[in-house]
Amino acid sequence: MAIWAKAEAWLAGPWLALNRARTLGTRAVLAPKGVLPFEAIPQFPGKKWMRVLQLWREQGFENNHLEMHQTFQELGPIFRFDVGGRNMVLVMLPEDVERCQKVEGLHPQRDVPGPWLAYRHLRGHKCGVFLLNGPTWRLDRLQLNPGVLSLQAMQKFTPLVDGVARDFSQALRARVMQNARGSLTLDIKPSIFRYTIEASNLVLFGERLGLLAHQPNPESLDFIHALEVMFKSTVQLMFMPRSLSRWTSTGTWKEHFEAWDCIFQYANKAIQRLYQELTLGHPWHYSGVVAELLTHANMTVDAIKANSIDLTAGSVDTTAYPLLMTLFELARNPEVQQALRQESLAAAARISENPQKAITELPLLRAALKETLRLYPVGIFLDRCVTSDLVLQNYHIPAGTLVKVLLYSLGRNPAVFARPERYHPQRWLDNQGSGTRFPHLAFGFGMRQCLGRRLAQVEMLLLLHHVLKNFLVETLVQEDIKMIYRFIMTPSTLPLLTFRAIS
């Protein structure tokens, strides 16, 4: 009983103050004359075993971003953190990200989720670039970039995404016009998830699923549920030593493996259909990213399959939640919404003629997406296992140290962003060319930036463009939404949104 009493007292402490956290005002530490040793870096308070106990009892770290945010307020812009035997250094200033990139070599190393590796090793699956480090990562990444991340690839798949975004807008309009009021109030989350699956599946595999025209098929619903379970169980397992979690979290491991089985099965079926069609006759036209890789990339089929599964799993939630949060922010900031609508209407004819022009014709909408990801980064951490010694905030960081950048705190720091609590897309246009590019880090940096970055940007940009042309988006909710950490950051609940047709 004594141990539980101590544990509960420790666990209660951080959470009592989280909702009262002040606006972060952390600036760089003024450097003394000599570089300080690693051991002098401020240490995250509390005992290591208590954090493992907390993780086990609460089945995750849903308030992880808030606790880390508060720790920066108390300790400054750098501190050490240890949980489950994993030592790391956390930072939150753009200058420290720049220093980390400057010491990157040919093979930037990142931390990879242990549960994801465990699943692939035990099932005998090859790893994609998200889970690789070293020369193998570089070889595969260089083969993938032309077909996925290049401007040429984006120009090819943008018209495909535009077709899905138009269909989404038309389907929503049909539902709205069924009401005599010409408006519809609903939970838009299921529709947005169906859109991201439909668009991503078309871009990756060249195949429409028909999710926008009718109720989704059971396989798609199972896939969405599997993604939710996979992300949530990842956090429940990744910070605990496997030697411990195999005994204390057997049910969670079972859920995690079953979720990945569903994800792999879903992607494998799409890959098998595409592979058969390609072997029967090479298509003369562009038919998606995976077809391009199978016909042009110098990669094995297993490597293409592994990376296709990573792209499939990573292209749904990570696009859907920024879309949902953007719609919410525009609904409670009608003046911003109107400015974006005017931009979209002015560019509508040019984008209709050539959807690729959306990238250059909608600068304020692109800024709005940056602003959403500043406040609500899907991945709250960027990390590097530094391969050479460096100095951060005048502390020596030895080679091999895991350094994590907390994007949640970086985006809410008034030393970097004036009035950070305000949703103000114009700030990104006002600051063009006036400073570092590192404040916008939602998709990572350097060679290890998100492989699906351009696909995600196009999916979000075109959907919002077509929605804003056709609907006013409204809400009664003005309060901030509570965000929770489940490997990605998601809203705990979403308010109803009203879509009102524009004649």
Curated annotation (Swiss-Prot):
Pfam families: p450. The keyword Membrane applies. Residues 1-24 form a transit peptide. GO terms for molecular function: corticosterone 18-monooxygenase activity; heme binding; iron ion binding; steroid 11-beta-monooxygenase activity. It is a peripheral membrane protein. InterPro entries: CYP11_CYP27_families (IPR050479), Cyt_P450 (IPR001128), Cyt_P450_CS (IPR017972), Cyt_P450_E_grp-I (IPR002401), Cyt_P450_sf (IPR036396). Its EC number is 1.14.15.4, 1.14.15.5. It is found in: Mitochondrion inner membrane. GO terms for cellular component: mitochondrial inner membrane. Transmembrane segments: none annotated. It is an enzyme of class 1 (oxidoreductase). It catalyses: a steroid + 2 reduced [adrenodoxin] + O2 + 2 H(+) = an 11beta-hydroxysteroid + 2 oxidized [adrenodoxin] + H2O; 11-deoxycortisol + 2 reduced [adrenodoxin] + O2 + 2 H(+) = cortisol + 2 oxidized [adrenodoxin] + H2O; 21-hydroxyprogesterone + 2 reduced [adrenodoxin] + O2 + 2 H(+) = corticosterone + 2 oxidized [adrenodoxin] + H2O; corticosterone + 2 reduced [adrenodoxin] + O2 + 2 H(+) = 18-hydroxycorticosterone + 2 oxidized [adrenodoxin] + H2O. GO terms for biological process: aldosterone biosynthetic process; cellular response to peptide hormone stimulus; cholesterol metabolic process; cortisol metabolic process; glucocorticoid biosynthetic process. Heme binds at C450. Pathway: Steroid biosynthesis; glucocorticoid biosynthesis; Steroid hormone biosynthesis. A cytochrome P450 monooxygenase that catalyzes the biosynthesis of aldosterone and other adrenal corticoids. Differing from other species (such as human, rat and mice), it is able to catalyze three sequential oxidative reactions of 11-deoxycorticosterone (21-hydroxyprogesterone), namely 11-beta hydroxylation, followed by two successive oxidations at C18 yielding 18-hydroxy and then 18-oxo intermediates, and ending with the formation of aldosterone. Steroid 11beta, 18- and 19-hydroxylase. Belongs to the cytochrome P450 family. This is Cytochrome P450 11B1, mitochondrial. It comes from Sus scrofa (Pig). The lineage of its organism: Eukaryota, Metazoa, Chordata, Craniata, Vertebrata. The gene is CYP11B1.
